[in-house]
Amino acid sequence: DQDFCGRFSEMNPDADIIVVFGGTNDHGHGDAPMGTEADRTPDTFIGACHFLFSRLPNQFPGAIIVVLTPLHRMGENIPKGESGWLLRDYVRVIRDTAAFYGLPLLDLFETSVIRANDPEIAAKLTTDGLHPNDLGHEILAGEIGDFLKGLAE
């Protein structure tokens, strides 16, 4: 169980596309503090985003690197950590940090139809209010595929 910062250097160096899709576990049960905009080490969530997003282009110079925000989930408005951060706070950090490094961002929090914070949608498209079921994965694959096709045009 290693975080993104600890495992990205072990990925295939010949990868054509790198997709960073994280943040929901940090909100749900992560133990790293949020940190400040000045942080650049993996010791805080903000620092880890800067650490990862600044290093990926150097580690994978020929790859397309894209960042996805978390999907909506059940419990997203339950404050987490000492500071009471909500999922949307983690989403904001991911958006802002991807923009800082000029990385393409698919804002699934804003655009995806998989809004598991709605109990009806959660029952139809997820297994547990977070993880997509087969239909949810089909929808998510289409959303990501359309985004990647748009980058290639």
State where each predicted segment sits.
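Alpha-helical cap/lid subdomain in secreted, periplasmic
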Residues: 3-153
